[in-house]
C-alpha cells in the first residue's frame, strides 16, 4: 500500500491502529529463544515455567531452635507449665541429621535444616533455657507444628511457577533460580523502527533557527521502547516528503 493511499484526506488514530494490526505479524513459537537468567530480566515468557521440584523440597525449620514432637504439648497445661527434653544432637542446614531418637528427645536445629523424622515442631531458641544436654521451655509458647515449613508449601512439583506472557521481574528470576533452571524460554525482542519527520525539526547539535525546534519526541519514543524491552532501530530524522517517506 502506498503512503498516499493510506493517508487520503486525513488519518484518524483508529485508522492507524487498524493499519498497524494488518501489517504486524504476531509472534509464534518459532520466535521464542532460550536465554540465561542473567540476560532474562524484563523479557516476556514464551511458555509456562513448570516446577521440576517442590519448594521447599523437604520439611524444614523456619527458626533456629529445637525440634521436637508436638504431641508432647498439653493445650490444657497451666500457664507456667514447662516442657523439659533431652537434646539428642544438632541438625545443620544443608545436611540431614542421621541420629537416633528416644521418646521425649529434641534436636537442636538451624533455620532451613531438614526436620528430623518424627519431629514436627520447632521452639525458637529465644524461648529456651539450656542446661547441659537438656532444654526447657514454656508449653504455652507455641502449638504443634509451629515453625515448620512443609515440603511443597511454596510450590509443588509439576505446578506452574510462572505463566506464559509474564514479564520477568527480579523476583521472578529468583523464583526460577530456586527451581534449578539456568535458562528460560522467552519471546525474541520486538523489532521496532522509528523516525522523526518535519521540516521544523532540528537534530541535536544543529544551530538554532527561527521557527524550528529540536527533536525531542524521538528520544522519548526511544526511552519508551527500550523500557518495553524492544530491539530499537533509530532511522533518524526523515524529510517531510512522501517520496522520501516511501
Where are these regions (language model features)?
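A generic alpha-helix structural signal
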Residues: 17-21, 41, 88, 125, ...
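Short, glycine/charged-enriched hinge/interface segments at domain edges or termini
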Residues: 2-8, 67-234, 239
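Short, low-complexity N-terminal leaders and the immediately following helix N-cap/first helix
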Residues: 1-78
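Noncatalytic alpha-helical scaffolds and linker/capping helices
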Residues: 241-245
Amino acid at each position: 500500500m502506498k503512503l498516499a493511499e493510506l493517508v487520503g484526506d486525513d488519518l484518524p488514530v483508529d485508522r492507524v491502529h487498524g493499519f498497524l494490526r494488518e501489517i504486524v505479524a504476531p509472534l509464534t513459537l518459532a520466535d521464542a529463544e532460550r536465554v540465561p537468567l542473567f540476560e532474562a530480566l524484563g523479557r516476556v515468557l514464551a511458555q509456562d515455567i513448570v516446577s521440576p521440584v517442590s519448594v521447599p523440597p523437604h520439611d524444614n525449620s523456619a527458626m533456629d531452635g529445637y525440634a521436637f514432637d508436638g504431641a508432647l504439648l498439653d493445650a490444657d497445661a497451666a500457664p507456667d507449665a514447662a516442657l523439659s527434653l533431652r537434646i539428642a544432637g544438632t541438625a545443620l542446614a544443608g545436611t540431614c541429621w542421621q541420629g537416633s531418637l528416644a521418646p521425649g528427645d529434641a534436636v537442636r536445629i538451624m533455620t532451613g535444616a531438614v526436620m528430623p523424622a518424627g519431629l514436627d515442631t520447632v521452639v525458637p531458641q529465644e524461648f529456651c533455657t539450656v542446661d547441659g544436654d537438656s532444654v526447657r521451655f514454656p508449653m504455652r509458647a507455641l502449638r504443634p507444628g509451629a515453625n515448620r515449613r512443609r515440603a511443597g508449601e511454596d510450590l509443588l512439583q509439576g505446578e506452574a511457577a510462572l505463566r506464559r506472557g509474564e514479564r520477568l521481574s527480579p523476583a521472578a528470576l529468583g523464583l526460577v533460580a530456586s527451581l534449578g533452571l539456568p535458562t528460560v524460554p522467552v519471546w525474541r525482542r520486538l523489532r521496532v523502527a522509528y523516525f522523526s519527520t518535519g521540516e521544523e525539526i532540528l537534530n541535536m547539535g544543529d544551530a538554532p533557527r527561527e521557527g524550528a525546534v529540536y527533536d525531542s519526541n524521538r528520544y522519548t519514543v526511544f526511552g519508551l521502547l527500550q523500557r518495553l524491552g524492544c530491539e530499537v532501530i533509530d532511522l533518524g530524522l526523515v524529510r517531510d516528503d512522501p517520496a522520501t517517506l516511501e
